[in-house]
Amino acid sequence: MTRKFLSAFLLLVLRTTLAAAQPTGYIISARDAEHLADEAGLRTRVAFFTDSLCTGRASGTPGSLHAQSAIARQFAAYGLRPTGGSYFHGFRTISGSAAHNVVGFLPGSGDRYVVVAAHFDHIGTLAGTLYPGADSNASGVAALLTLAQMFHHLKELGKTYAHTVIFVALDGKEQSLSGSHYLWNEIAGGLLRDPRTGVPISQKSIDLMVNIDQVGGTEAPLHKNRPDYLMMLCEPENGRRDALLIANLNADVKLDLGFDYYGSKDFTRVFYRTISDQKPFLDHGVPSVMFTSGITLRNNKVTDDAESLDYGIFRRRVLAMFHYLARIL
């Protein structure tokens, strides 16, 4: 079974996104990339990251290395550029585990940046039992890779965006957000450089941080009989909620959207400000957004497996995030 998933995953890496030449006068639209957000592709990605090959993706394990390598291969296939000669940015977690963020740049036409991130680590294999972590957070990594593929496709068609997108697959989230803290320290220390210019990326040049954390589940809906939901947690004044509302309607996604955590100010504060990877950015004044479908009873259980996700709804969520980003880039 591992070989089957690995072969299918490699086909995604090799799958070309180049399109036939467009007729003169053709206006490139974000809709030209929608076909890349397909249920089969999302299912294949989640199946790979939850397979026994990745052993639950705990930081510092061989399974984590398999996950990192697969992410880097897809970054390369989708034209994302490494910085400092490598996609891998190594650090130690709070427990001392050797961990790596995977970082790739999709160049824009200006000198402003949007960070799009999702953590790939999970709790691993404990006492011989594999914890797959499909929703948490193979779903986020599958979404991240699909978004990278979609924006690369538009760039190949000739579309340009003002912002450079920094795609980051984060390690060490399960160890006190070690990966996102390390990413922030790279930025604060002038160590993260634009591969086009070699210029350090400063806090002031980042217009938005977008974190994708659990976007595959459907078991904790906002409203009865609406499993097709998505939450975007952000500050009202800088989260650009209107962009998501417009994207949800214009792209014909029509999800049930929420902008707080189930109506609770306290839980919204915890999930937005404390326990996910946008925290280091928020702590330093960078506008940030978190996309999530919320915690379910499957979290950190063996039942959080690839078959527990609804890939039709998952696809619609990816489309909503894609069109949201396309509007703000």
Where are these regions (language model features)?
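N-terminal signal peptide c-region/cleavage motif recognized by signal peptidases
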Residues: 14-16
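Alpha-helical metal-binding/catalytic segments enriched in His/Glu/Asp
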Residues: 104, 116-117, 122-177, 321
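A non-catalytic alpha/beta surface segment that caps or lines the substrate-entry region
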Residues: 48, 56-106
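Second-shell loop/turn segments in exported
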Residues: 28-36, 52-62, 90-92, 127-137, ...
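His/Asp/Glu-rich mid-to-C-terminal helical/loop segments that flank catalytic regions of hydrolases
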Residues: 292-329
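Metal-dependent peptidase/peptidase-like ectodomains
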Residues: 111, 170-276, 288
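Structural recognition of the beta-strand scaffold that forms the well-ordered cores
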Residues: 48-50, 101-105, 113-117, 166-169, ...
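Solvent-exposed loop/turn segments at secondary-structure junctions
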Residues: 53-56, 75, 81-82, 94-97, ...
